[in-house]
């Protein structure tokens, strides 16, 4: 079977470009094309600007060349691919270009595609506004309906005529991790098929990415090889930023905290320092909106379920986050269920902090599981399974040695950077559902001038969204529709967290289906952005819409607000 799979590519097609996709370059006037072949071939592009109406030109009069690299898969047959990368430069802002990629000498070309060059700030202001598709966790299987609707977003309802039918302009597709399930499966052939499946979308609009846990195989090699993001040679596509009109888009590597075999604490320190400097450098007059994406979320829509022991002791929701904050009860040090990792962490903190730890007899309240705590506070951890379950502090010798090298830095509070620099929106995947938060910081809902369910006016904290319902074989398609609605109202989520505003597909099980959906973010102006969420289960029905409105940007503590209510009572939970 393995040999049969390896021979499915015929000799005549081995030089044909496959999985063509775009990404933004480091400069505003660039567009990067990436594709693969099964045999070594040239890296050529022929392209030309469209006519006055954007239609196809009479010929593709311009030529460009790029680089090719050999990629040997780590699977049992060491299958070979050639990854081709070409960058078009000096593109006219907002102009539509038509292009083909392939090998000019062999005459092996892809079909003809088009793309729109990045626009100037003035062009975005004139309209149409910047629109970004946001989704994560999309697999080769289970994603047919999602891919169909994404294709319609790009090409209009007549998907058979993807050249001439164009929906309202979509400027980018942003996917925050978990591709194909998995890119390396079947000696990389699952990844090949997935990239081909995404080509009707990603060959027309830039596909900007961040890595998830399903890319972890062999040190994230398939992710690093198949995609090319800005500054990819420095970071292997794991963290970068790019300006697109009014938006400063930042990708970061949430997986660095959970894979000690691939990323050490020195790496996390570099990424953390880079993010701090990058966010500080943003000109919030030129690019008022700061949007961040990664794979693992910082928050949960529901409190962690109580263990039997916790329920018997009075219902205190005790999480490993208690140990991170240094709050503990001496009498409970050796209690059953507290992992040796946590006990070791306690000793480590005592040594690091001079033996000064805050004591607290009883910890109460709701917190998320350790995985979210680790993501929010930036604490290097280890998970027993790739899906993130059973996570705990990573106290292995390699980490501790690395911590000493960076002055005993044992946590990298990424959420603090969001608050410090005024990150407006952060979206993630990992959980196969859709939910959004109220503006939140340090597990507290932070009001602005007016915060309602659908309108966040002058918020004082980052809004977090999980858009991990991209469709994959691990998702359940039940007989009944997903649970949808306001988190805290009657009939909403059991044990809903106070920061959870709206959800779809979180409370699944029995006969209920999970949600299969994607988001579209529109930046109407420097003072308003709107998120719309569409369900592929309901024939593209819009299931949620909400907006952030603020005329003041930058660090939340330094923003000029028109008023300051400052009370949780200002949160409205009715439409």
Identify the role of each PLM range.
Residues 15, 19, 25-32, 37-44, ...:
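N-terminal active-site segment of His-dependent metallophosphoesterases
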Residues 8-44, 49-61, 67-73, 80-82, ...:
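Metal-dependent phosphoesterase/phosphodiesterase active-site architecture
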Residues 204-213:
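Active-site HxH/HxHxD metal-binding segment of metal-dependent hydrolases
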Residues 142-150, 175-176, 190-197, 219, ...:
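Stable alpha-helical elements in mature extracytoplasmic
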Residues 88-89:
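Hydrophobic core positions of the immunoglobulin-like beta-sandwich fold
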Residues 198-204, 457-459:
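Short, conserved loop/helix-junction motifs that constitute active-site signature segments
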Residues 132-134, 173-175, 209, 292, ...:
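Residue-level marker for buried hydrophobic side chains located in beta-strands
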Residues 1-8:
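Cleavable N-terminal signal peptides of Sec/SRP-targeted secreted and luminal proteins
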């Amino acid at each position: 079977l393995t040999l049969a799979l390896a021979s499915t590519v015929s000799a005549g097609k081995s030089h044909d470009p496959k999985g063509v996709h775009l990404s933004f370059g480091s400069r505003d006037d660039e567009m990067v094309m990436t594709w693969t072949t099964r045999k070594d071939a040239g890296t050529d592009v022929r392209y030309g600007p469209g006519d006055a109406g954007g239609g196809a030109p009479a010929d593709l009069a311009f030529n460009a060349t790029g680089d090719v690299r050999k990629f040997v898969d780590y699977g049992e047959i060491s299958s070979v691919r050639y990854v081709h990368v070409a960058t078009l430069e000096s593109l006219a802002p907002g102009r539509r270009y038509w292009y083909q990629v392939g090998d000019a000498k062999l005459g092996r070309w892809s079909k003809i595609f088009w793309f729109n060059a990045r626009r100037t700030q003035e062009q975005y202001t004139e309209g149409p506004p910047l629109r970004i598709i946001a989704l994560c966790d999309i697999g080769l299987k289970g994603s047919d309906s999602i891919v169909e609707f994404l294709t319609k977003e790009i090409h209009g309802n007549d998907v058979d005529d993807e050249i001439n039918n164009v929906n309202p302009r979509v400027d980018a597709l942003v996917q925050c991790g978990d591709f194909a399930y998995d890119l390396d499966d079947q000696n990389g052939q699952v990844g090949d098929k997935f990239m081909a499946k995404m080509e009707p979308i990603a060959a027309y609009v830039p596909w900007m990415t961040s890595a998830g846990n399903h890319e972890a195989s062999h040190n994230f090699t398939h992710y690093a090889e198949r995609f090319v993001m800005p500054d990819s040679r420095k970071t292997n596509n794991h963290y970068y930023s790019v300006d697109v009109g009014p938006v400063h888009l930042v990708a970061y590597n949430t997986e660095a905290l959970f894979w000690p075999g691939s990323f050490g604490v020195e790496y996390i320190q570099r990424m953390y320092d880079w993010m701090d400097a990058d966010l500080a450098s943003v000109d919030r007059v030129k690019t008022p909106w700061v949007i961040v994406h990664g794979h693992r979320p910082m928050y949960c829509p529901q409190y962690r379920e109580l263990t039997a022991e916790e329920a018997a002791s009075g219902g205190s929701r005790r999480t490993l986050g208690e140990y991170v904050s240094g709050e503990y009860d001496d009498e409970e040090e050796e209690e059953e269920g507290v992992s040796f990792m946590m006990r070791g962490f306690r000793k480590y903190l005592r040594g690091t902090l001079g033996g000064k730890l805050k004591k607290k007899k009883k910890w109460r309240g709701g917190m998320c599981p350790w995985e979210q705590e680790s993501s929010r506070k930036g604490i290097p951890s280890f998970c027993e399974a790739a899906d993130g379950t059973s996570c705990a502090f990573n106290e292995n010798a390699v980490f501790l040695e690395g911590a000493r090298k960076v002055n005993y830095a044992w946590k990298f509070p990424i959420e603090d950077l969001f608050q410090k620099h005024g990150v407006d929106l952060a979206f993630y995947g990992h959980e196969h559902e859709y939910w959004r938060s109220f503006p939140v910081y340090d597990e507290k809902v932070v009001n602005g001038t007016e915060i309602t369910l659908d309108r966040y006016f002058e918020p004082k904290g980052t809004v977090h969204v999980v858009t991990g319902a991209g469709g994959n074989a691990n998702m359940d398609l039940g007989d009944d529709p997903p649970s949808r609605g306001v988190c805290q109202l009657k009939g909403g989520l059991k044990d809903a967290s106070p920061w959870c505003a709206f959800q779809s597909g979180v409370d699944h099980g029995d006969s209920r289906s999970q949600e299969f959906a994607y988001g579209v973010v529109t930046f109407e102006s420097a003072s308003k952005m709107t998120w719309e969420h569409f369900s592929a289960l309901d024939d593209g029905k819009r299931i949620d819409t909400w907006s952030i409105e603020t005329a003041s940007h930058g660090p939340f503590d330094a923003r000029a607000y028109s008023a300051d209510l400052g009370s949780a009572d200002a949160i409205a939970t009715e439409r």
